[in-house]
Amino acid sequence: MSRMKRDGHRGRNFKIRAVFVGVLIVALLAAGYVLGRKWELSQYQEQRGQMSSGFGQIPTIEVEGVTYEQKMNLTTVLLIGTDRRSDEVSEGYRDGGQADFLLLTVVDHDAKTIRQLQIDRDTIAPVSVLGLFGNKAGSRDMQICLAHGYGVDKQERCKNTLASVQALLGGQSIELYVEIPLDGIGALNDLLGGVTVTLLDDFTASDPTMTAGKTLTLTDQQAEILVRSRMSMAVGTNEARMSRQRIFMDAAVPMIRERISENSGFASEMLDSLSPYLTTNMVRGRMINELNKAYHYD
């Protein structure tokens, strides 16, 4: 392999690692919903696969005649970005807003690797729906972003979204979730003193200063415009919006890493600023351990 290819490979691995570290840093700040790690290595779905007879056997799945064993020592995190603000009140059991951003991160502790899958909000998947009085009303195939609309509270909406992603992926288990509302993006941007990006699209329908090709340090409102805008854009596809969301993340994560390296108290400052916005089932101590391990992975 040439040096250029090796350097490119290292660059991609660093970028993936940086994004995951950023996700874990943000997730760490919630520290409010204690679930523990009782599922790890023990709870697996059986759809589209089978469990060999006998206690402790590894689940397998067959694809095109090839049998694969399920990896056991994994940490899986679903990052959910919603189209609601944290102070918006949901009315009823079917008004929880939509999941505009879905990013699944898989950490393989044996292989010491980190892999990501960003899921288009318009993907059709099984969604568990509720009736007017909160009763379970079966499952329907619809846009996966709509799964977040169903639930009695934020935790239940996250779980419903996670269940739809699991179903989309053939019943594979996802252990952890982090939900970030729309104004959480602005809060993160403010904490970092403004994230600097180069705009690849024209946003002047929402902000006359956000012209294509301009390098701009975002205000909180501009950060929300960048990650949310779609219908007002020349290219109004969700694929284009997904690219813009990654532009913001790719710019924000190195800033987070730099702040932490410069100031050991920055994590506490982040906790104070972001914890009111986040919903998660992650435990603070667990996140510290995951962060320390994943920092050295490819």
What are these model-derived regions, one by one?
Residues 2-25, 29-298:
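Non-catalytic, solvent-exposed segments at the cell envelope interface
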